[in-house]
Amino acid sequence: MNNNLQGDAIAAAIDVLNEKRVIAYPTEAVFGVGCDPDSETAVMRLLELKQRPVDKGLILIAANYEQLKPYIDDTMLTDVQRETIFSCWPGPVTFVFPAPATTPRWLTGRFDSLAVRVTDHPLVVALCQAYGKPLVSTSANLSGLPPCRTVDEVRAQFGAAFPVVPGETGGRLNPSEIRDALTGELFRQG
């Protein structure tokens, strides 16, 4: 996609996000659906779309670590833990951090932590940079159906009018690995 078309798609996606709606976009492995993490209305729309209970918690993806800092508590990290995390980012590894009390429950669910990732997908990086904050991100698929890997699959599952940022996935076969930021415990193999 040339830069003008990509810029137009990102600008259109930001308009949708500002309307507290959900968008789809390519990530490292599959298409994701996401929304503004600061909008309870938008997050509830995403959860309803996915038929996902709010208590499960969600993942935020960002262009850089600074975008994630308002949502996580990294004060307990040692230098070694920080080094481990930053050696994986940007990339397809999600880390679960303690969350401060100010992080909304519609993001953390029943947990006192939040899963976050600094993406290396160039289109998602550009989207988060243009939006100025991270996005809630979960796989683009309706309950019981496989995750979408193309724009056509997104449209088949969510409808022709669903807002999609066109592009290619990063080609990974598996979803992101998920690890505990403090202990390194593996929650999901990537």
From Swiss-Prot:
It catalyses: L-threonine + hydrogencarbonate + ATP = L-threonylcarbamoyladenylate + diphosphate + H2O. This is Threonylcarbamoyl-AMP synthase. GO terms for cellular component: cytoplasm. The gene is tsaC. Residues 7-190 form the YrdC-like domain. InterPro entries: DHBP_synth_RibB-like_a/b_dom (IPR017945), Sua5-like_dom (IPR006070), TC-AMP_synthase (IPR023535), TC-AMP_synthase_SUA5 (IPR050156). GO terms for molecular function: ATP binding; double-stranded RNA binding; L-threonylcarbamoyladenylate synthase; tRNA binding. It is an enzyme of class 2 (transferase). It comes from the Bacteria. One of its GO terms (biological process) is regulation of translational fidelity. Belongs to the SUA5 family. TsaC subfamily. It is found in: Cytoplasm. Pfam families: Sua5_yciO_yrdC. Gene3D superfamilies: DHBP synthase. Required for the formation of a threonylcarbamoyl group on adenosine at position 37 (t(6)A37) in tRNAs that read codons beginning with adenine. Catalyzes the conversion of L-threonine, HCO(3)(-)/CO(2) and ATP to give threonylcarbamoyl-AMP (TC-AMP) as the acyladenylate intermediate, with the release of diphosphate. It comes from Shigella flexneri serotype 5b (strain 8401). PANTHER family: SUA5, THREONYLCARBAMOYL-AMP SYNTHASE. Keywords: ATP-binding, Cytoplasm, Nucleotide-binding, Nucleotidyltransferase, Transferase, tRNA processing. The keyword GTP-binding does not apply. Its EC number is 2.7.7.87.
